[in-house]
Amino acid sequence: MNRDDKLRILGDAAKYDASCASSGSSRKGKGFGNAAIAGICHSWAADGRCVSLLKVLYTNKCMYKCAYCKNSADNDVERAEFEPYELADITLEFYRRNYIEGLFLSSGVVKSPDYTMERMIEVLKILREKRFNGYIHIKAIPGASQILLDKAGFLADRMSVNIELPSQRSLMLLAPDKSKNSIIAPMGHITERISEHEGTRRGAGSYSPAGQSTQIIIGATPDSDKQILSLSQGLYNKYSLKRV
């Protein structure tokens, strides 16, 4: 499979991630423009700028069987996986052409959380070694080691860990391979590291200087509005999240 085919598959597979809500939504009527096209999304940098990002998965191969996910191991979809240098090269090419100002990188979980996280970190490492100074948002993989979370945080501008669903009961129902602790633990670790390095600039020992965020799937389970709002407020208070 060539690089363009991988980009087509993995850009499309990433477009419904709510952390970049400018893509994945359809428009009706006769106006021009399309927000449903995969590949480019918009986010807010630490200094308040709105930046255009290449939004893509490292791979849509996944060992998990989450009922809400298009890339579930049970689903019959076209699969692809980048090599780290391929995705780094694409990002640099798009950046030099002024198509994007940064990268939003997520992934399915292939082989193990640590293996997947290592491959994603390698993409970031290549970019920074090639003096890429653009914005990077990386989705941390629940279950990955703290050592890998540390490596990612020193390379990225923002990190996020998806809380996925409002309760452990909901996780058991729709994402039985995941647990609340595997999600909350990395959130807490990232919060601690951000606090320890607060005020330092990226490249001078800063850790995820634009903070961390998360997302929750609403409406797929019987959790009440009160539960969801209480959870969101608790996440903001305990983990100093930039956005839920």
Role assignments for model-derived ranges:
Residues 53, 66, 105, 161, ...:
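Conserved, mostly hydrophobic/aromatic
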Residues 56-85:
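Canonical Radical SAM [4Fe-4S] cluster-binding loop centered on the CxxxCxxC motif
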Residues 74, 108, 164:
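Flexible loop residues that form catalytic
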Residues 1-61:
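Flexible, acidic/Gly-rich N-terminal and inter-domain linker regions that tether
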Residues 6, 65, 99-101, 132, ...:
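Short loop/turn motifs at secondary-structure junctions
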Residues 88, 111-244:
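Conserved AdoMet/S-adenosylmethionine-binding subsite of the radical SAM
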Residues 55-56, 85-96, 199:
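Short, charged beta->alpha transition segments
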Residues 90-108:
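Short Fe-S-cluster ligation motifs
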